[in-house]
Amino acid sequence: MSTYHPKSGDITRKWYVIDATDVVLGRLATHAADLLRGKGKPQFAPNVDCGDHVIVINADKVHVSSNKREREMRYRHSGYPGGLKTMTLGRSLEVHPERVVEESIRGMMPHNRLSRASVKKLHVFAGSEHPYAAQKPETYEFKQVAQ
């Protein structure tokens, strides 16, 4: 029997909603990246986009451990000389919480063309409302680790 190679048309995509309230940012990012890549599916192939759509709500209530809100810095550059802008993670979470969550999820993905295509299936919202109710998304539950 020959090896099964999935095609992009054979993949059925599901929609998941992740509530980011009091979830650690890195844990949220790894689970969302795995869903976007389709790592939990039996027909996963690293060269085919077989991931699901992920909706992250309540991005403004995500938990950042330790004192990273004051210590960690976010950088962006305008492209002009002297155009480096810096902002702490806490200030960035106040201004654009959805952008912080998107960047952390994008950082957990491989840095190639396929991941740039699968990141387009990520939808992040600061509040609890989202416009994708017609797709009937399932809620994604995090498994609790015994401490």
Swiss-Prot record:
A Pfam family of this chain: Ribosomal_L13
Keyword tags: Ribonucleoprotein, Ribosomal protein
GO cellular component terms listed in the entry, alphabetical order: cytosolic large ribosomal subunit
Disulfide bonds: none
InterPro entries registered for this protein in UniProt: Ribosomal_uL13 (IPR005822), Ribosomal_uL13_bac-type (IPR005823), Ribosomal_uL13_sf (IPR036899)
GO BP field: negative regulation of translation; translation
KW Ribonucleoprotein (keyword) present: yes
Molecular-function GO term, any one: mRNA binding
Transmembrane segments: none
CDD domains: Ribosomal_L13
Highest taxon listed in the record's lineage: Bacteria
The keyword DNA damage is assigned to this record: no
Alphabetical list of HAMAP family matching this protein: Ribosomal_uL13
Assembly and interaction partners: Part of the 50S ribosomal subunit.
Function of the molecule: This protein is one of the early assembly proteins of the 50S ribosomal subunit, although it is not seen to bind rRNA by itself. It is important during the early stages of 50S assembly.
Family that this chain belongs to: Belongs to the universal ribosomal protein uL13 family.
Protein name as catalogued: Large ribosomal subunit protein uL13
Classification lineage: Bacteria, Bacillati, Actinomycetota, Actinomycetes, Mycobacteriales
